[in-house]
Amino acid sequence: MKTPLTEAIAAADSQGRFLSNTELQVVNGRYNRATSSLEAAKALTANADRLISGAANAVYSKFPYTTQMPGPNYSSTAIGKAKCARDIGYYLRMVTYCLVVGGTGPMDDYLVAGLEEINRTFELSPSWYIEALKYIKNNHGLSGDVANEANTYIDYAINTLS
């Protein structure tokens, strides 16, 4: 899994050299942001149930057909609603994993790689998850550097889905 730290080390090691000043600055920058990133991951994890529930309701409000159409890919039943919440939770977990490692590696490796195929196979609309992530971003209750760190990866997920 790629992170800014592993990429800097891999680049230096592949060339048989020590880290350059630029690479050390990248590493230092990550350490400077690490506390805020970990605080964001903790807060999102602690509030996950509330955020996921609110995000699902935001999807149902913006796309009411998702609760009216029958079928396994819609939220017209309790099982469908549980699947929607599970999927939103997956995106939120990926955001927290990115916060912990300080890079998009987890999202790139576990989400982005097969995202288009999954959405096509199960007839899932990326716009549902974009709406859910926007809700999470606007309602996570974080501020300052902690919010900036969280929003970086939420925005990355939104852009990936767009």
From Swiss-Prot:
One annotated GO biological process: photosynthesis
Stored CDD domains: PC-PEC_alpha
Protein encoded by which gene: rpcA
Membrane-topology descriptor: Peripheral membrane protein
UniProt similarity note: Belongs to the phycobiliprotein family.
Keyword Electron transport: yes
Quaternary data: Heterododecamer of 6 alpha and 6 beta chains. The basic functional unit of phycobiliproteins is a ring-shaped hexamer formed from two back-to-back trimers contacting via the alpha chain subunits. The trimers are composed of alpha/beta subunit heterodimers arranged around a three-fold axis of symmetry. The phycoerythrins also contain a gamma subunit which is located in the center of the hexamer.
Subcellular location(s) of the protein: Plastid, Chloroplast thylakoid membrane
Record protein name field: R-phycocyanin alpha chain
Other comments on record: The light-harvesting antenna system in red algae and cyanobacteria is formed of phycobilisomes. These are composed of the phycobiliproteins phycoerythrin (CPE), phycocyanin (CPC) and allophycocyanin (APC). Cyanobacteria also contain phycoerythrocyanin (PCC). The phycobiliproteins all share the same subunit composition and organization with variations in the covalently bound open-chain tetrapyrrole chromophores.
KW Thylakoid (keyword) present: yes
Sites where the protein binds (2R,3E)-phycocyanobilin: 83-87, 115-124
Keywords carried by this UniProt record: Antenna complex, Bile pigment, Chloroplast, Chromophore, Electron transport, Membrane, Photosynthesis, Phycobilisome, Plastid, Thylakoid, Transport
GO terms for cellular component: chloroplast thylakoid membrane; phycobilisome
Function: Light-harvesting photosynthetic tetrapyrrole chromophore-protein from the phycobiliprotein complex (phycobilisome, PBS). Phycocyanin is the major phycobiliprotein in the PBS rod.
Post-translational modification remark: Contains one covalently linked phycocyanobilin chromophore.
